[in-house]
């Protein structure tokens, strides 16, 4: 099944991601600034990961980490290459834009990810509440817990020669769902409600709007079916 996604405008702008999805790979890139490299960023990541997964010989000057799976290493190296391309290209002479990048790969009941910035990634199993895999504290939430401020990610790709990447793996079961939430806040209901059956995008949207009707967000729901 395909990724289902939607945006909610609220009162303050939040960029929508450029999306690539195929049967096993999901790539999201959001541009913060006037830059125009989000699609190229996605294309470069897809090209590298597809080649690596297809046993095509790919070379990189970045270290292969033995503490990670092969799949997580592919995603991590693709992210490092993407960061290098933006830092030495669009941002070579001055900072133009930073990018949030999320790469998720599913293969043989193993879910792998590499990420700089958001969105939050959560996994849901039938009858259980959502469990976070990655959660990000927005800078605006650090500055003020009560006033609605413009969103600003803690981590962005392309602003330095290196970048902080969150990556890992988890085993998933048939009928699990992956929830991606580009937002400053997460609804309390996400962690307390456990409706029977598959979770719908409409239900998550309702939870988010009820608690923070003025805060913009982007939501994605990806069924984890091989």
Regions found by a protein language model. Give the residues of each.
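A residue-level signal for conserved active-site and pocket-lining positions in enzyme catalytic cores
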Residues: 82, 118, 183
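Short, surface-exposed beta-strand-loop junctions and turns on beta-sheet-rich folds
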Residues: 118-121, 128-131, 139, 186-187
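C-terminal catalytic subdomain
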Residues: 2-4, 162-226
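Conserved short alpha-helical segments that host acidic/polar catalytic motifs at enzyme active sites
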Residues: 79-81, 85-86, 111, 146, ...
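Helix-loop-helix
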Residues: 47-90, 192-214
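Short glycine- and acidic-rich boundary segments immediately preceding or forming the N-terminal edge
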Residues: 1-13, 81, 136-137, 142-144, ...
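Conserved, helical-rich catalytic subdomain that frames metal- and/or nucleotide-binding sites
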Residues: 71-72, 131-180
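N-terminal entry segment of metal-dependent catalytic domains or homologous docking segments
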Residues: 1-58, 92-106, 110-111, 119-124, ...
């Amino acid at each position: 099944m395909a990724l289902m996604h939607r945006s909610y405008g609220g009162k303050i702008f939040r960029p929508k991601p450029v999306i690539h999805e195929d049967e096993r790979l999901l790539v999201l890139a959001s541009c913060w600034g006037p830059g125009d490299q989000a699609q190229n960023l996605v294309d470069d990541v897809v090209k590298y990961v597809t080649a690596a997964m297809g046993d095509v010989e790919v070379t990189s000057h970045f270290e292969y980490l033995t503490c990670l799976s092969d799949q997580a290493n592919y995603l991590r190296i693709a992210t490092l290459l993407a960061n290098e391309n933006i830092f030495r290209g669009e941002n070579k002479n001055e900072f133009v834009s930073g990018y949030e990048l999320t790469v998720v790969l599913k293969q043989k009941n193993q879910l792998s990810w590499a990420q700089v910035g958001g969105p939050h990634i959560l996994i849901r199993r039938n009858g259980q509440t959502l469990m976070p895999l990655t959660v990000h504290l927005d800078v605006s939430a650090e500055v003020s817990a009560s006033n609605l401020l413009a969103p600003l990610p803690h981590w962005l790709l392309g602003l330095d020669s290196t970048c902080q990447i969150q990556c890992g793996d988890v085993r998933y079961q048939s009928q699990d769902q992956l929830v991606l939430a580009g937002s400053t806040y997460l609804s309390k209901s996400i962690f307390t409600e456990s409706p029977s059956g598959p979770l719908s995008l409409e239900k998550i949207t309702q939870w988010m709007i009820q608690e923070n009707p003025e805060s913009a967000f982007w939501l994605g729901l990806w069924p984890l079916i091989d």
